Structure formats: C-alpha cells, structure tokens
A protein has these predicted regions:
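Conserved N-terminal entry element of GNAT/NAT acetyltransferase domains
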Residues: 1-11, 139-142
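Hydrophobic pocket/interface hotspot
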Residues: 16-17
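Conserved GNAT-fold acetyl-CoA-binding loop/helix
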Residues: 24-43
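A short helix-loop-beta-strand connector motif used in the catalytic cores of GNAT acetyltransferases and
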Residues: 44-53
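Conserved beta-strand in the GNAT
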Residues: 59-75
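A short, internal acetyl-CoA/4′-phosphopantetheine-binding micro-motif in the GNAT/acyltransferase core
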Residues: 71-85, 104-105
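Conserved acetyl-CoA-binding loop-helix of GNAT-fold acetyltransferases
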Residues: 82-95, 112-116
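Conserved beta-strand-loop-alpha-helix junction that forms the acyl-donor binding cleft
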Residues: 102-115, 119-120, 126-132
Length: 142
C-alpha cells in the first residue's frame, strides 16, 4: 500500500468539501464550520493554499493535507479511515521536513499516531467546545 501527495487543484474542491463537512471530520477540527463549494472556491482563489491531495495506488482520492507554514493536518475520507493512509501520508511528507506542528484534540484517536510518528506535546493548548486542543511538534533532529 502506498500513497501519493499531489498539489490540491480547484477541481478537487468538491471532494475536499465532502470530507471537510462530514460531521466526523468537523468534530476533530479547531474550526468546525460548514463550508459551501462557493466559499471554498473563493478561499482557494484568494489564498492559493499549498495543500496536498492524498491518492492511493488506484488513483482514488483518499484525503488531503492541510499546510499553513509549519502547521499541518490531514483529513481522510470516512470510507478510508483506520486503514493506515494518514500514517503513510504523514511519513511521506515528514521525509523531507525537519520541523512541523499540528493541533489535535486530546481525545482524538489520531493523537496516538502523531506520538508514534515522533510528535510531542508542547504544553500549549486551547480549550475549544469544552475540549483541550493540544499543540504537538515534530523535530527531525531530536
């Protein structure tokens, strides 16, 4: 099993919205708002994000990687969760990265994955929707 990371294109936005607006995705994000395709298209054209599409060996869209400077995160389509795709995508991305950070709710199952990948808690957190939202960092040289 392998994944490929490709630049997210405007034509991928309907897929992004399908994943992003799923309740199981939104519940784990700092911003749990619903977005329309129109909202996303305007955002995409204005921000020109360096986000990545995650595809599998069959060229099926699996999810996407959010990148904002050093801050990263992955959202996987519900049909492909718990199959190792997020781990593979993070590993591929981190191969060429010395530092990255992310935010995760303390009760998110993915926190264990982040720890296994080498992310550590910084002690910094926010309280969102009555839950702790923790900052974790990855430093290759440690």
């Amino acid at each position: 099993m392998e994944v490929t990371l490709l630049s997210l294109l405007e034509s991928d936005l309907p897929f992004l919205i399908e994943v992003r607006n799923d309740e199981s995705t939104r519940s784990q994000l700092g911003n749990d708002s619903l977005f329309t395709l129109e909202d996303s298209t305007q955002w995409f054209k204005k921000e020109q994000p360096e986000w990545l599409l995650i595809i599998n060996h069959n060229l099926t869209r699996i999810g996407y990687m959010r990148i904002d400077g050093d801050t990263i995160g992955i959202d996987i389509h519900p049909n492909f969760r718990r199959k190792g795709y997020a781990r593979l995508a993070y590993q591929k991305y981190l191969e060429d990265t010395d530092y990255a950070d992310l935010w995760v709710f303390e009760d998110n199952h993915a926190k264990k994955l982040y720890e296994e990948l080498g992310f550590v808690e910084t002690g910094e957190y926010e309280t969102l929707r009555d839950r702790k939202y923790l900052k974790m960092i990855y430093e290759k040289w440690k």
